[in-house]
Amino acid sequence: MNMPSEILLGARRWFASTSFSLAAVYDAPLKKAIGNIKKFSIGSLGLTYMISPVMLLLDAGGLSLGTRMSMVFLACTTTSLSTAIIHWAAKSYVSEATLKGNVLSLNTFNILGKKRLSQYTLDKLKIPDTNNSRPFANLESTTVPKRYFYLHPELATPIFNAIRQAQQPKQINKNDSK
């Protein structure tokens, strides 16, 4: 089998009268790392803000209050900025995706590193033009508010193929219209 083990593509036909269903499952290789980075980042942000008053109150080797205030300001600004950048870059990262029929379920991480589920029908998703797209995203919703997602292209081929197929205009068979 040429496909990676992270993707399970299966077509199931059960013995009873159940219908044929096609399912694609995507499991991101970096989901644990991204989740841990987000949790560490928000933890360090909280710790920085909790310890800031202590840094102001302690007399640290003759440093003036202005110097201590600028150190606290710099620490809080740096931690806030790094947490914001990590969240912005990783909020589109899809940790798990499941395609069942015409519905794609996507799990991403919120700012706290907890899973966030989004579900879309395939006609509400599009593969954007790479020149005009948001960085760190290769899939976007067409609904408002617009959401962006990143799936590893080499691991999510069945999902991208299904979206491309859903984007193609439907052809009307002339024999059916009579």
Swiss-Prot record:
The residue ranges crossing the membrane are none
A Gene Ontology CC term for this entry? Answer: mitochondrial membrane
Pfam families the UniProt entry points to? TMEM70 (PF06979)
Q: Which residues form the signal peptide?
A: none
Read off the InterPro entries from this record. Answer: TMEM70 (IPR009724), TMEM70/TMEM186/TMEM223 (IPR045325)
Biological processes, Gene Ontology terms:
mitochondrial proton-transporting ATP synthase complex assembly
Name used for this protein in its record = Uncharacterized protein C1834.10c
